[in-house]
């Protein structure tokens, strides 16, 4: 039907400088980047109420910024494009120059990498995957790609990776049988299985890693960063904050405890250690 | 319904009237169907547009939410471009809170329906907006416009299709009626031929029943009628033949009897005259009276016999008519001369107003006989001292009238029906006026034998006028 299109106008105000688009859209708002793990809509449905809450509590406007894919998120993180960021890729050596500093971590238990298959799959052990096609969320997924691939390489199991774009994507492919096994975030997979009614088998699990932290860019004033950290950390103890956390948590299939705790880079030292020793060289 | 009673409508052939009626019925029904169908289509289109607008407002935010959240304007533009490719979507525009605006406009749909039709449908473009809100955050607003032109075009095309179907139905209706009637009414022409044959005297003509049950019943009824007519005519022919035989026998009898009577009657009259004029032995007064009675009665009887013989000749067809140019005045003068003594006896003035130049096509003897009868009657039934006038006048193109006008007492209304009946003297049988009662009968027969007409007019107390009309020479 494109031939019928008479005119397609793109009146773009500031479209050439899409980097600060969120800021332009929200005036003086600080950007809040989220690693692309779920669909942008689901991500927005989860984070926008939280950011509105923060604004109400602190007066600091935070504009959600979601990239199309995790690598695009990482590119922005690497360039220091976000004022705040919800991601665990900041620990990659290549991101170190951006200088993001951890200020909050999830109250939930630490995540782990799981290599899973459907419960009725003929695959029963990791060795059965040798020479097989295995699904991963993306090259940027820490527990979804870097950790499990590092383990497979150390075990000498050669697999052909295919990528689903994000966690939801590869889990969807596993569900419909497009991949025989997938490497996933243990918590995300659990929520997906509960929501979609998928029964699966865990072939391997990694050591726990604290889930994605919220970090702040050095350019953000300290008082602002502290105010944001306090507001988010106190949500779990504030009835209104807890209501938001519960409602948004249900959207993505989270289990309690909801919310975040104040944190520091020490809580994520194993990330740094992993990146230092990993055999996987194509982590994004 | 006035046209169905008008003469011009009724003069149209049955097939034409049927076709016109069927066509009008189809046109009226078709027009009503088209009107209501188009109106319903317009209502449906209006409802569809509103429904589509509502559906787009409900689904569009979700469709663009992903790219709006990401801020992927190029993909958003592609989505908007795809949306304007949808049916009825004229334009779509997205504007975020900061004023960034993306818009896609479809090429205008070319109108195919005439302006009056679009105006009659009263379909307008519809517009609406929908907010793109995700997680309680307003990302922007989508404004969309649906054009009604496509719906107008569709309804117009459907109307044209319906018109084509209606035209096809009328065509099939025409063809069907024509074929059915041509085959169904074919027996009518044979029926017409049969009726014409009957009219021309072919009483044995019958039509083989064929066609529809109604036509078969009609043909059977025609045959029954022909059968009855034939039987009736056979009876009439037999009756006529019997009557002619009887008439001829009567005429023959009368002729014979008249001849047989005339011979002795002439002897009686002859000897009576001898007695009356015998100078050697003159009659005394009583004898004179008796002989006068014998002579008067004999003359009356002789006149009667002559008239009867004339009538018998006419009825038997033995009367020879020779049509020629006859000067009426000469015939009239001769009649006046013959009857003048009787007129003088009654002191009646006879006036001849016949145009001396007037000539008619007639048999001279017959014309003289007719005029003689009329003049004789005019004198006999006139009043003493009265007047009798013979007058000529034109009577229509090519015809002339000869009138005999008396000043008698006229003919009473109740007696006029028997005026031309033989031997009917209209109550004068017992009077002292002598007559046979068949003069007018003979006059009528003779006049009609010459191709003319006879008639009269009478006023009681004033007199009567008898006339004949004959073709002018």
Model-predicted segments: where are they?
Chain A
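Extracytoplasmic small-molecule ligand-binding "clamshell" domains
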Residues: 26-90
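Short loop->beta-strand "edge-of-pocket" segments that line small-molecule binding or catalytic clefts
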Residues: 28-37, 43, 127-144
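A local structural motif
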Residues: 55-65, 153-164, 198-200, 280-284
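Short helices/loops that flank or line small-molecule/ion binding pockets
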Residues: 71-85, 97-98, 127, 168-183, ...
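Pocket-lining segment of extracytoplasmic ligand-binding domains
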Residues: 121, 132-230
């Amino acid at each position: 039907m494109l031939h019928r299109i008479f005119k397609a106008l793109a009146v773009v105000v500031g479209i050439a400088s899409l980097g600060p688009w969120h800021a332009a859209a929200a005036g003086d708002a600080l950007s809040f980047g989220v690693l692309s793990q779920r669909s942008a809509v689901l991500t927005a449905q989860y984070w926008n109420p939280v950011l509105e809450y923060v604004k109400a509590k602190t007066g600091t406007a935070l504009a959600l910024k979601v990239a199309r894919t995790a690598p695009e998120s990482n590119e922005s993180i690497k360039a220091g494009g976000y004022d705040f960021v919800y991601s665990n890729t900041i620990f990659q050596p290549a991101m170190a120059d951006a200088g993001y500093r951890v200020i909050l971590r999830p109250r939930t238990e630490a995540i782990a990498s799981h290599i899973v298959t459907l419960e009725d799959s003929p695959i029963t052990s990791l060795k059965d995957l040798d020479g097989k096609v295995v699904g991963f969320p993306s090259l940027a997924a820490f527990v979804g790609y870097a950790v499990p691939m590092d383990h497979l390489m150390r075990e000498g199991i050669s697999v052909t990776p295919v990528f689903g774009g994000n966690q939801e994507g590869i889990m969807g492919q596993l569900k419909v049988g497009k991949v025989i096994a997938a490497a996933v975030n243990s918590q995300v997979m659990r929520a997906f299985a509960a929501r979609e009614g998928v029964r699966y088998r865990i072939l391997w699990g990694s050591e726990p890693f604290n889930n994605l932290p919220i970090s702040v860019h050095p350019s953000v004033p300290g008082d602002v960063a502290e105010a944001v950290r306090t507001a988010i950390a106190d949500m779990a103890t504030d009835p209104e904050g807890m209501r938001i956390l519960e409602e948004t948590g249900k959207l993505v299939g989270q289990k309690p405890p909801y919310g975040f705790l104040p944190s520091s880079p020490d809580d994520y030292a194993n990330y740094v250690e992993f990146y230092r020793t990993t055999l996987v060289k194509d982590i994004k | 319904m006035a046209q169905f009673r008008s003469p011009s409508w009724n003069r149209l052939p049955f097939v034409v009237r049927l076709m016109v009626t069927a066509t009008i019925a189809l046109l009226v029904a078709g027009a009503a169907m088209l009107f209501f169908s188009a109106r319903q289509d317009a209502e449906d289109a209006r409802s569809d547009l509103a429904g589509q607008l509502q559906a787009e407002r409900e689904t569009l935010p979700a469709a663009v939410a992903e790219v709006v959240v990401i801020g992927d304007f190029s993909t958003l533009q592609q989505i908007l471009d795809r949306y304007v490719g949808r049916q009825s979507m004229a334009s779509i525009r997205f504007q975020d809170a900061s004023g960034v605006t993306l818009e896609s406009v479809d090429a205008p749909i070319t109108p195919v329906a005439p302006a009056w039709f679009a105006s009659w449908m009263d379909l307008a473009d519809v517009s609406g907006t929908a907010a793109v809100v995700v997680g309680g955050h307003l990302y922007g607003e989508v404004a969309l416009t649906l054009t009604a032109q496509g719906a107008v075009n569709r309804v117009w095309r459907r109307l044209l299709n319906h018109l084509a179907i209606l035209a096809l139905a009328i065509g099939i209706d025409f063809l069907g009626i024509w074929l059915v009637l041509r085959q169904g009414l074919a027996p009518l022409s044979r029926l017409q031929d049969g009726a014409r044959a009957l009219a021309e005297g072919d009483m044995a003509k019958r039509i083989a029943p064929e066609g529809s049950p109604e036509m078969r019943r009609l043909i059977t009824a025609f045959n029954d009628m022909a059968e009855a007519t034939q039987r009736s005519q056979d009876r009439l022919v037999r009756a006529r033949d019997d009557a002619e035989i009887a008439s001829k026998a009567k005429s023959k009898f009368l002729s014979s009897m008249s001849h047989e009577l005339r011979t002795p009657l002439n002897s009686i009259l002859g000897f009576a005259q001898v007695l009356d004029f015998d100078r050697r032995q003159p009659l005394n007064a009583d004898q004179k009276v008796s002989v006068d009675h014998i002579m008067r009665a004999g003359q009356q009887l002789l006149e009667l016999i002559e008239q009867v013989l004339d009538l018998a000749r006419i009825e038997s067809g033995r009367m020879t008519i020779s049509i020629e140019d006859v000067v009426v005045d000469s015939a009239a003068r001769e009649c006046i001369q013959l009857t003048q003594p009787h007129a003088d006896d009654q002191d009646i003035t006879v006036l001849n107003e016949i145009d001396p130049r007037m000539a008619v096509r007639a048999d001279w003897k017959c014309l003289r006989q007719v005029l003689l009868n009329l003049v004789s009657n005019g004198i006999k039934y006139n009043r003493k001292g009265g007047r009798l006038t013979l007058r000529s006048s034109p009577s229509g193109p090519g015809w002339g009238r000869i009138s005999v006008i008396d000043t008698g007492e006229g003919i009473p209304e109740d007696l006029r029906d028997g005026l031309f009946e033989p031997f009917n003297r209209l109550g004068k049988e017992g009077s002292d006026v002598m007559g046979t009662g068949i003069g007018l009968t003979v006059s009528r027969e003779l006049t009609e034998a010459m191709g003319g007409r006879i008639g009269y007019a009478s006023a009681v107390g004033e007199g009567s006028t008898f006339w004949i009309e004959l073709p002018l020479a």
